[in-house]
Amino acid sequence: MNIPLTPLRFLRYPEQQFPRKTALVCGDKRFSYAEFGARVGQLAGVLRSLGVQTEDRVAFRSTNCHRLLEAYYGVLEAGGVLLPLNIRLSPQELAYVLNDAGVTTLFLESAFLPLAEAFRNSVSLIKNFVLLDGPPQTSWLMPQNYDDLLSAATPLRRDLMAVEENSLAELFYASGTSANPKGVMLTHRNLHLHALSVALAMKSSHETIELHTIPLFHANGWGAAHLITFLGGTHVMIHRFDPAEVFRHPTPYLALDCE
């Protein structure tokens, strides 16, 4: 029997084995593995209700937050391909990436709405705009925001035995220092094996608490979005890494009670 390799397996295990353990911390929000998994299933249900089909590109323009981490599993559960967007790209670069990747659904934080206005009319394939935070923006075809959609969603989880491990799972764009940004394609198998190899090299364990200082859109966050879940550790998300702020008030990060 061939068992497909996919990072979706990483979340299923801690959901079942230690559902009450803290999986994710973001500001004053904490989610157990059971709650994390439930939100992932709700996101997958939202995407399917929006018409996302197998290998449709779903982009997130977001700083590090719990919603972006949920996308690393929810988009794949829906059969889509996740594209975390570099928040430092110009409107022209963003329009190029969105069109080149064929993105059909875009999630974005409210802070990026003014910038997004500059490329909105330059993208042709996007059918769905979803606001990650803040009040709904009807002028942007966003009658509901992310959490509203999740609360009304019918949860969806994939049959992992039906996953094609060599199918595309995530898509990242390099900076394009000499030309336009170039897409980097990662399969389910790529992501699964990378997490396993890094876990062995770093000698990490279920006690690991990862402060995500690297943006998840940068080099896939060095794989930490999947590595920590695979270990059954705890993700700690901060929107922007400010060294002075972290070391001025280190207690929330260094003394987390995550059990």
Q: What annotation goes with each model-predicted range?
A:
Residues 3, 20-65, 69-73, 90-95, ...:
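Conserved AMP-binding/adenylate-forming core of the ANL superfamily
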Residues 19, 136, 151-173, 180, ...:
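Conserved pre-ATP/AMP-binding loop-to-beta segment of ANL
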Residues 32-34, 169-193:
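Conserved AMP-binding A3 loop
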Residues 44, 57, 63-83, 87-91, ...:
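A short helix-loop-beta submotif of the ANL/AMP-binding
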Residues 49-50, 77-148:
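Structural core segment of the AMP-binding/adenylate-forming
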Residues 58, 75, 106, 168, ...:
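Conserved S/T- and glycine-rich ATP-binding loop of Class I adenylate-forming
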Residues 63, 108-117, 214, 239-242, ...:
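Adenylate-forming
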Residues 192-209, 217-257:
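Conserved AMP-binding/adenylation subdomain of ANL enzymes
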